[in-house]
A protein has these predicted regions:
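Flexible C-terminal active-site loop/helix
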Residues: 1-18, 26-43, 304, 326-403
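Conserved, mostly hydrophobic/aromatic
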Residues: 3, 64, 86, 125, ...
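Metal- or metallocofactor-binding catalytic centers and their adjacent structured scaffolds
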Residues: 44, 60-136
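Short beta-strand elements
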Residues: 55-62, 372-373
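Metal-dependent enolase-superfamily TIM-barrel catalytic cores that perform enediolate-based chemistry
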Residues: 151-265
Length: 403
C-alpha cells in the first residue's frame, strides 16, 4: 500500500460555537485589547489567533483507504506545512510505517520546527496514518495500541465558564445531575486585576464547591494567565477547596516557574497542553514541575508521540489526562494504563435554550464530525472503529472551510 495524496483543509473557528467567546482568563489577558474578563470582548481569541480553528488532514492511498486526522487550535501555516513539505516526504511511501514516517517528518522540519506549527502538522498526518492502519484491518485504533484497559472511559465536564453566577451555578448543578465526578472551571482574573481579581477567582470556586458538594472534584484552568508570584498566592487561597488540579498557571516555557509553584502548594499542578514531543514533556517530568501531564494528541506529535510521552510519565508515576476529548484522544486513553479520564465539553441547557431554533450546537471540533461521543453518567463508551472512527460531516466541513 502506498500513500498517493495528502490534503489539508483550514476550518473556521466559527465551527466551535460561542464557547470560545465567553469570559475567560488567557495567556493574552495582560493586554487590555485581548482581555475578556467581563464578556464584553467576545472576539478576543480571534484577534490574536486568527480565523483558523482546525486543520483537517486527509491521507489517500492506492488501496482506496483514506485516513483522516486534524490539528486543533490551529493556524493557517499548518496546512501549508502539510501540503508543501510533509506531503512530499510521505507520498509514495507505505502508510503502515508510522514510526519511520514520523521520524522522517520530524527530522526534515527541524530547521523550522521542533515545536509549534510543524509538530501540529506532523500530528495531523500521524493521526490520519493511524486511521488508515485501523481501517485496513477493520479494527478500532485502540486495539492497535495494546487493547482497551476498561470497557468505558471516565470523563470530566470541562465547560464551566463564569458567564454569570446564575449560569455558573445552574451549569454546575446540571453536571452533578449528569453523573460527572469532576468539573473544570475557567478562571477569570490574573495579576492585572490585583487583589480584587483574586477574591473574584476564589468566589467562583467557592460557588461551584457549594453547588457540587464535597464528593465531586473541581479543577481550575488559568490558561497561562498568571505569573509565578500570583499563582503561588492564588493557590494558597484555593487550597481549602481541595481542588483536583490547577491547570497551566504560567506560560509553558517557564519550567522553573512550574516547579516553584508545584513545590509551594498542596494543589496538584497540571500542564503540557501547549508542550510538544517527548523531549518537551520530559523536561516537565524531570523538574517535578507537574503532578498531572496533559499532552494534546493533535499538538504533541500525534498518537505515535503521545504514546511515548505517556510511557515517560509512567516512569515518574504521573497520570496523563490529555487535553481535549476528540476521538483520537479517546483511542489513546482507552489503551493507556496511566490515563484515568478524558476531557469532555458538554453543551449546557442555558446555552441551548438561548439558541435560535435550528441553529447548530457544537463545541470545538464536534461540528465537523458526525456523531460525536456522548457520555452517560460521566462515562464515555469506547470509541468506535474501524480506525479512529470519526467520520467527517462533509456538509459542515464545506460550510466552515476557509479558502
Amino acid at each position: 500500500m502506498e500513500i498517493t495524496d495528502v490534503t489539508a483543509t483550514n476550518v473556521d473557528a466559527e465551527s466551535w460555537g460561542e464557547f470560545v467567546e465567553f469570559p475567560n482568563l488567557s495567556v493574552m489577558s495582560g493586554y487590555e485589547e485581548y482581555r475578556n474578563t467581563d464578556g464584553e470582548n467576545p472576539e478576543f481569541r480571534r484577534k490574536f489567533m486568527g480565523p483558523v480553528g482546525d486543520v483537517v488532514v486527509e491521507v489517500e492511498t492506492d488501496a482506496g483507504i483514506t485516513g483522516v486526522g486534524h490539528a486543533n487550535w490551529a493556524t493557517g501555516s499548518i496546512a501549508t506545512i502539510i501540503e508543501e513539505t510533509l506531503s512530499k516526504l510521505v507520498v509514495g511511501r507505505d502508510p503502515r510505517q508510522r514510526e519511520k514516517l514520523w521520524d522522517i517528518m520530524y527530522r526534515a522540519t527541524i530547521p523550522f520546527g521542533r515545536k509549534g506549527a510543524a509538530i501540529e502538522a506532523i500530528s495531523g498526518v500521524d493521526l490520519a496514518l493511524h486511521d488508515i492502519a485501523g481501517k485496513e484491518v477493520d479494527k478500532p485504533v485502540y486495539e492497535l495500541l495494546g487493547g482497551p484497559v476498561d470497557d468505558s472511559i471516565d470523563c470530566y465536564a470541562s465547560n464551566l465558564h463564569p458567564v454569570s453566577e446564575e449560569t455558573l451555578e445552574r451549569e454546575a448543578r446540571e453536571y452533578v445531575e449528569a453523573g460527572f465526578d469532576t468539573v473544570k472551571l475557567r478562571m477569570l482574573h490574573g495579576p492585572e486585576d490585583g487583589r480584587r481579581g483574586m477574591k473574584e477567582n476564589e468566589r467562583i470556586v467557592e460557588l461551584v464547591r457549594d453547588v457540587v458538594g464535597d464528593e465531586l472534584a473541581i479543577a481550575a484552568d488559568a490558561y497561562m494567565g498568571w505569573s509565578v508570584r500570583y499563582a503561588k498566592k492564588m493557590c494558597s487561597r484555593l487550597e481549602k477547596y481541595d481542588l483536583a488540579w490547577v491547570e497551566e498557571p504560567v506560560i509553558p516555557d517557564d519550567i522553573d516557574g512550574y516547579a516553584e509553584i508545584n513545590a509551594s502548594t498542596s494543589i496538584p499542578i497540571s500542564g503540557g497542553e501547549h508542550e510538544f514531543t517527548r523531549w518537551g514533556h520530559e523536561r516537565l517530568l524531570e523538574r517535578d514541575a507537574v503532578d498531572v501531564l496533559q499532552p494534546d494528541v493533535h499538538r504533541a506529535g500525534g498518537l505515535t508521540e503521545t504514546k511515548r510521552i505517556a510511557d515517560l510519565a509512567s516512569t515518574h508515576d504521573v497520570p496523563v489526562i490529555p487535553h481535549s476529548g476528540t476521538n483520537p484522544t479517546l483511542h489513546f486513553i482507552a489503551a493507556a494504563t496511566n490515563a484515568p479520564m478524558a476531557e469532555f465539553f458538554p453543551i449546557p441547557e442555558w446555552y441551548t435554550e438561548r439558541q435560535p431554533e435550528g441553529e447548530r450546537e457544537s463545541t470545538y471540533a464536534d461540528a465537523i464530525y458526525a456523531d460525536p461521543p456522548t457520555p452517560t453518567d460521566g462515562e464515555l463508551p469506547l470509541p468506535p472503529g474501524p480506525g479512529i472512527g470519526a467520520e467527517l460531516n462533509r456538509d459542515a466541513l464545506a460550510e466552515f472551510a476557509l479558502e
